[in-house]
Amino acid sequence: MMASDRVRKRHKGSANGAQTVEKEPSKEPAQWGRAWEVDWFSLSGVILLLCFAPFLVSFFIMACDQYQCSISHPLLDLYNGDATLFTIWNRAPSFTWAAAKIYAIWVTFQVVLYMCVPDFLHKILPGYVGGVQDGARTPAGLINKYEVNGLQCWLITHVLWVLNAQHFHWFSPTIIIDNWIPLLWCTNILGYAVSTFAFIKAYLFPTNPEDCKFTGNMFYNYMMGIEFNPRIGKWFDFKLFFNGRPGIVAWTLINLSYAAKQQELYGYVTNSMILVNVLQAVYVVDFFWNEAWYLKTIDICHDHFGWYLGWGDCVWLPFLYTLQGLYLVYNPIQLSTPHAAGVLILGLVGYYIFRVTNHQKDLFRRTEGNCSIWGKKPTFIECSYQSADGAIHKSKLMTSGFWGVARHMNYTGDLMGSLAYCLACGGNHLLPYFYIIYMTILLVHRCIRDEHRCSNKYGKDWERYTAAVSYRLLPNIF
């Protein structure tokens, strides 16, 4: 893509509106962003994930298909010689052209909604921010524009799904789970294809060469990505599309398909399935309602686009984030009223903490600190950082509200919600609890990784901030 085609804008201020201040080169802070070199520990982790993550997804899905979602039974069969990985693999449904057609129609439909239907909901929904929005400043000092229309895409998709189930009957509501393992093949094909395309594109025709980072290691470059914001044309942004669509839009449809399968098999839908559908739908709708805010999060602001995001959004997210609903298809559980109420309360309290924490940060950014947090004017620490174009920018780190309790209370709320999904499945099997285990590892790692980047970005200013807010996730604990 030629430079004249790039969608970018240079600002004199930071994302929160502060003004740029020129400094002497000797006094400038180090340039922020991902490191140019990779250590052996990170490289080992990358190779391990490249080899192990696809196997883990297949193992969990096949364990549900052949062992009612038990993890121990297939392992015992393997240990006792009653089965081999080859025999388990052979018993699983294979790729089908019917599933390929379903998935191709699905992805194409989401591309059309993303590219061809400009957002109109922001014109009629008070408080909703959609349409063309600016992203955060990249390490090279660029600010990309995005068409934020995820909520609209989600609503159109689900209205059509409900109309089909109730009136048109073009396809069965169980179409997703009925083709679940063949669809796993299809999502893997797309995940590897888009990751490989992004890898090659970074070498041949990067969107913004200033934001590309080559570590010198092919495995790390492929896994973690080279381009920061790869695009095709002016508006098709790989990060925004593949993270939100087709994965997260599909999340609630997959859960609805699970519920329909429960109804088909047993003649009823359990309260546990309803809880999982409702709590996860709240999270999904929240994501799309706040999609403009998502443009300022770590996925967009720090992560380059590689296999980690490309394959992860196509395969890992839709198959492993929905494990609770899949488990309940094979193991229908009717929870007691106190148990169901406890799960609901935990999930809603977790969502409240997650949402209010993010709202406080967004409000603080939009008003440049001229607002009220918990009835008081927020306190903050002013920081500075340097982008690759040499400009010095100001930023403010809030130390009030939930952000004064711990540095990542939004993650704390997220983990509470994740635990609620798992507790809805009872305690007979480990598999539905994989999600809380994974999310704990992911978010703790993100805490450490994000803070390492912030330390590099802000230097001594970050030390002042961590002295003011001592804990990461849990006050007085961690």
From Swiss-Prot:
Q: Does the keyword Transmembrane apply?
A: yes
This protein is called 7-dehydrocholesterol reductase
From which source organism is this entry?
Answer: Danio rerio
Its lineage reads:
Eukaryota, Metazoa, Chordata, Craniata, Vertebrata
What is any one GO biological process for this UniProt entry? cholesterol biosynthetic process
Enzyme class name? oxidoreductase
Protein residues bound to NADP(+): 361, 365, 398, 403, 410-411, 450, 454-458, 465
PROSITE patterns, per the entry: STEROL_REDUCT_1, STEROL_REDUCT_2
Q: Which pathway does UniProt place it in?
A: Steroid biosynthesis; cholesterol biosynthesis
Primary residence? endoplasmic reticulum
> Where does the record place the region Disordered?
1-28
Q: Which gene encodes it?
A: dhcr7
Q: Name one Pfam family in it.
A: ERG4_ERG24
Q: Where are the transmembrane segments?
A: 43-63, 97-117, 180-200, 269-289, 309-329, 333-353, 424-444
